[in-house]
Curated annotation (Swiss-Prot):
InterPro entries: AB_hydrolase_1, AB_hydrolase_fold, Epox_hydrolase-like, Haloalkane_dehalogenase_2. Monomer. Catalyzes hydrolytic cleavage of carbon-halogen bonds in halogenated aliphatic compounds, leading to the formation of the corresponding primary alcohols, halide ions and protons. This is Haloalkane dehalogenase 3. The gene is dhaA. The lineage of its organism: Bacteria, Bacillati, Actinomycetota, Actinomycetes, Mycobacteriales. One of its GO terms (biological process) is halogenated hydrocarbon catabolic process. Its EC number is 3.8.1.5.
Length: 300
């Protein structure tokens, strides 16, 4: 039986980006292996996976702006924490961290959109991409199970503010509802900590679902996803697809589509959306094997 560690991995470090302090983990030496979380999580999501990669490179996990231990934006409001703003902060942090070449990306949720976008812009610097429950193509509402569809349609309506900013629905309901096991109070409190204060401190958890590329909106995110998708479906960049069973956002036609990507290895692990909380051992072992294979092929 898997033992689920509750302590964060590594020691938090901080860099100032555009006047805001951003938090990250940076452990070990060698070529970078970059773990990127999405909504509403933080680098804490990777705590039971990163240890599997020790000795295989420099392990980096960043907290997105307004999330984890990174600063909040001020003033805040409906126009803050868009995909573009999050990207600008994260890419500036990655630049400041000097990730070098031969980067391996490990991506989940919105971290996948950010990572796929960065990889598409830095194709010669990326050695391989591992991804799980990722944003691989624009979606339609028909792709969403009815029970979840209603909640996410709510986020994209005027009800989104009370749902997320007052009631903290994304952290209190969506997160635990997309994990097979029950998180301990200590684990939940790690995820709650950045969003303890009601109101605008919780804005990132609302801006993210409003940025999801669904039924053609928002147009700029749909265009971006189509741009990196067009590259991923033809590039021989090595890929590891960690398929979640039953999964949440890579299911049905989207799962069939992503299986068409070239030079891709696939494993299946138990999990809904936050698969790292259900299958860390399997995920960590698979990523370690993937990285060893990449390094071996490169003669490292």
């Amino acid at each position: 039986m898997t033992a689920f560690g509750v302590e964060p991995y590594g020691q938090p470090k901080y860099l100032e980006i555009a006047g805001k302090r951003m938090a990250y983990i940076d452990e070990g030496k060698g070529d970078a292996i970059v773990f990127q979380h999405g909504n509403p999580t933080s680098s804490y999501l990777w705590r039971n996976i990163m240890p599997h990669l020790e000795g295989l490179g420099r392990l980096v996990a960043c907290d997105l702006i307004g999330m984890g231990a990174s600063d909040k934006l001020s003033p805040s409001g409906p126009d803050r924490y868009s995909y573009g703003e999050q990207r600008d902060f994260l890419f500036a942090l990655w630049d400041a961290l000097d990730l070098g070449d031969h980067v391996v990306l490990v991506l989940h949720d919105w971290g996948s959109a950010l990572g796929f976008d960065w990889a598409n812009q830095h194709r010669d610097r990326v050695q391989g991409i591992a991804f799980m429950e990722a944003i691989v193509t624009p979606m339609t509402w028909a792709d969403w199970p009815p029970a979840v569809r209603g909640v996410f349609q709510g986020f994209r309506s005027p009800q989104g503010e009370p749902m997320a900013l007052e009631h903290n629905i994304f952290v209190e309901r969506v997160l635990p509802g997309a994990i097979l096991r029950q998180l301990s109070d200590e684990e939940m409190n790690h995820y709650r900590r950045p969003f303890v204060n009601g109101g605008e401190d919780r804005r990132p958890t609302l801006s993210w679902p409003r940025n999801l590329p669904i039924d053609g909106e928002p147009a700029e995110v749909v265009a971006l996803v189509n741009e990196y998708r067009s590259w991923l479906e033809e590039t021989d960049m090595p890929k590891l697809f960690i398929n979640a069973e039953p999964g949440a956002i890579i299911t049905g036609r989207i799962r069939d589509y992503v299986r068409s990507w070239p030079n891709q290895t696939e494993i299946t692990v138990p999990g809904v959306h936050f698969v790292q909380e259900d299958s860390p051992e399997e995920i960590g072992a698979a990523i370690a094997q993937f990285v060893r294979r990449l390094r071996s092929a490169a003669g490292v």
